[in-house]
Structure formats: structure tokens, C-alpha cells
């Protein structure tokens, strides 16, 4: 795997070296995030503004206040964009571009959307790969629940927990594939974490022949929030 990509072992090394969680008030957590990402502070995802309920926001400075129950997921909120590497049973190895959006509307969950497109050897987009959408929740006991659907015909439920205040690991409890979906997709786990440069790294591992193997990984920089 190219050195610029984020392997499972690399992510684990980075995140385990981070400072363990400390108690933060809601204001302290928001202020810390605001200081780290000044360059993307002026941008937000579009909203029509004419609904009787709050529009989604991916910028903690705009829209409704983040629900207090989501403070452990606060660093994820924003739009992230970058490149990654895939090694799948269906299509082999390839490079991809990706955009991930974590947004909220003031309620006690985050909305999640991922768009992935294939890249050629020169880094140019060649084809849309697939999309994911879903919701992230976390309990008062720091138990994470994630519900995801894939445009390829997959629905998954993940459970997990924060590893520290900058990393979150989830494992699939249920993976359902439609008749036209990727029949070889097995159960898996994911790790999302902020790297020392404050980029978001993530990796997806899947069960293949009785062992977990990296399937997709990427390093993304914040462009909104």
C-alpha cells in the first residue's frame, strides 16, 4: 500500500500515541475544534432555509447547537476530502477520491454521507464508485451505534466505542447484502481517527478466508467546518 495511504497498523500507531480523553465542557470542545480548523471556518453545506425545522450543518459555528450527547463525536463534524486505496474481491486494487460529510441538525445523532470515485494513475477521476449514507449515535456510556446503507446494495449495523478523544472504532454486528449486491462482502470493522496533522484517516477491514484484511483506507483533509 502506498505510504501516503492509511493502513490499519498506521492508524493504530498514531491514535494510540494520542493523549487519552480528558473531561471537556461543551464550550471547550467547540473552541478547540474551531481553533484547529480556521481555514475551513467560513464554509458550510448548502441549505434551503425554508423548512420549519433546522437545516443540516457541517460547521459548528453555524446552525443549531450540537446536541450535548454528541460531544464525544464532535471532532468528526465537517466535510472531509482526499484520496485512498482499495483492495476488494470484486474489483481488485485501485486508487479513489472520497468526500465524507458528518453533519447534524441539533438532534442527538450525526448524519453521514460518503461519495467515492475511482482515480487513474495520474489522479484524474475516471468513474463514480459507490456511495454510503447513514447515522451515527453514541450513548451516555460511550457506546457508538452506526447504521449504514451502500449504493451497491448493502445495509449494515455497527457498534463500537471511542478509543480516545481523537479515534473511534466500530465493528459490524449485521451485514445484509441484496441479491444484486457484493456477495463476497463479509463482516468487518472500521477505525476513524484524527492524525497528528489533523487530517481524518480511516480504514475498513473485512473478513476474508477467516482473517481480517484491509479493504479500503483513506486520508482526508477538512474542507468545511
Curated annotation (Swiss-Prot):
Domain of life: Bacteria
Matches recorded under InterPro entries: Calycin, Nb(III)_bact/plant, Nitrobindin, THAP4-like_heme-bd
Database matches in CDD domains: lipocalin_heme-bd-THAP4-like
GXWXGXG (motif): residue ranges: 78-84
Protein family according to the UniProt entry: Belongs to the nitrobindin family.
Alphabetized PANTHER family for the sequence: PEROXYNITRITE ISOMERASE THAP4, THAP4 PROTEIN
The protein, known as: Ferric nitrobindin-like protein
